[in-house]
């Protein structure tokens, strides 16, 4: 997948300079904006573009767009505030300091929910291998604002790193984090028209989770490793897992 950087139509000089700066940082070619993205794709041979403008950058590929949003995080934190449980947060330590490493940042939903839940007693570091999702997420975190100031603060506290979790874990010292979390991309997602995420899927990394990676994660974490996957995932047959919980297909 070859990606370029461009701007909205009729961009002013400040937007163009920002796009050029980010293209250099990401190692993507900067392409001056033409008439249509379809024509630019045909002319350049690129498969998609990160587009910069007056608002947050977005990713475009084959007619599909992906913009920063936090999935169900707003709903989940609202429910937590009302005293209702969250399946992921219920697995985190109930008290004491807790530093979490989210190895699969993706849409930011899980990182944001955990960051809010751990306010005052923990920190979330998130990794994203895809340079596209990292860039959309980096800008999204920095510019995020919600009417709920506690959620705004939590999102902005997330420390997002552009990294492959395999390489990052290998470089970590023993017991560097309390909890390590994996939510790998489903290679065969359930198709729902109302949840069309083709732009996101086109940009995502699809690395397989192995027992070797989990053993490395166990070395790096002090308390537990959490994995979100389909119940039929073969990796759950390995005895490395001490607790498997299934609900609604996960």
Residue ranges, per PLM feature:
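Conserved class I S-adenosyl-L-methionine
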Residues: 96-106, 125
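Conserved Class I SAM-dependent methyltransferase catalytic core
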Residues: 210-250
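S-adenosyl-L-methionine
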Residues: 1-99, 127-179
